[in-house]
Amino acid sequence: MAKPPVRKPKKKVCAFCKDKVTYVDYKDTNMLRKFISDRGKIRARRVTGNCTQHQRDVATAVKNSREMALLPYTSTAR
């Protein structure tokens, strides 16, 4: 039997580029929580759809936010 053709998933659009955001603020924890998994890990670019530069900015902002105790390093869920 022949396999059906494989469809490529649609490329996700960077939310920051779409909204023309120039600065990712580490104090905006509601926005940063979208880029953190339930275990507290920073989600990958292929999952979030961010471009390279904004993914770097998000990672830096999350790390700064953790350092300032605005976001947890790990989750309490087990």
From Swiss-Prot:
One of its GO terms (biological process) is translation. It comes from the Bacteria. Keywords: Ribonucleoprotein, Ribosomal protein, RNA-binding, rRNA-binding. GO terms for molecular function: small ribosomal subunit rRNA binding; structural constituent of ribosome. PROSITE patterns: RIBOSOMAL_S18. One of its GO terms (cellular component) is cytosolic small ribosomal subunit. InterPro entries: Ribosomal_bS18 (IPR001648), Ribosomal_bS18_CS (IPR018275), Ribosomal_bS18_sf (IPR036870). NCBIfam families: S18. Belongs to the bacterial ribosomal protein bS18 family. Part of the 30S ribosomal subunit. Forms a tight heterodimer with protein bS6. Binds as a heterodimer with protein bS6 to the central domain of the 16S rRNA, where it helps stabilize the platform of the 30S subunit. This is Small ribosomal subunit protein bS18A. The lineage of its organism: Bacteria, Bacillati, Actinomycetota, Actinomycetes, Kitasatosporales.
